[in-house]
Amino acid sequence: YNHQDVQITPDIYQAYWDKSIYSLEQIIRSPSTPANIYTNEVMRKHNIKITMAGDLGDELLCGYPRHRRVAADQKIKTWKDLCRYFVLGGKPAIKVNKNLIPKEEVLDEFIKTFSDVMWDEQDKLNSFCLLELVTVCPEDFLNRNDKFGMAYSMEGRYPLASKTFMQYCMAIPSTEKFSKFQLKNMS
């Protein structure tokens, strides 16, 4: 095992901006994409062929500050409330369409796509995390790692994305996943 730190400088970040967009074939709302693609290049130069990613860990184990906010939000009482928070809350949406599509219409389409079968009124935070797992994770994380790996002829593996492990984590009540003082209580 030969660990190597990868340093990301402002010059590297700028130099890999266009390559990250080209490889993804789209712009996504992640400021880390230039650093991610550069890291893939460094791995390839060290003859790495298969990469292991820890993606999904935060979503499975309530590791983000937003998870604490969801748990504390008293306005989230229904699936629609949770979807409203997910679609309209959190990070502000980029005004790509100049708001031509009303936000409520976007919310209605989202709810048609993702049914309330994921809603657990006893654990709204686990419901939120499950929603992240079926939306953000495949669209952003898995897609990004797959395309960046392909750009350098590497294959990405996602050990936390196994069905068994995901079901295990989602069966743990969210109250056990973080404490009042610490996110990622279980990691």
Q: Predicted segments — roles?
A:
Residues N40, L133-F141:
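Core structural elements
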Residues Y1-F128, R144-S187:
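ATP-dependent adenylate-handling active sites, centered on carboxylate activation for C-N bond formation
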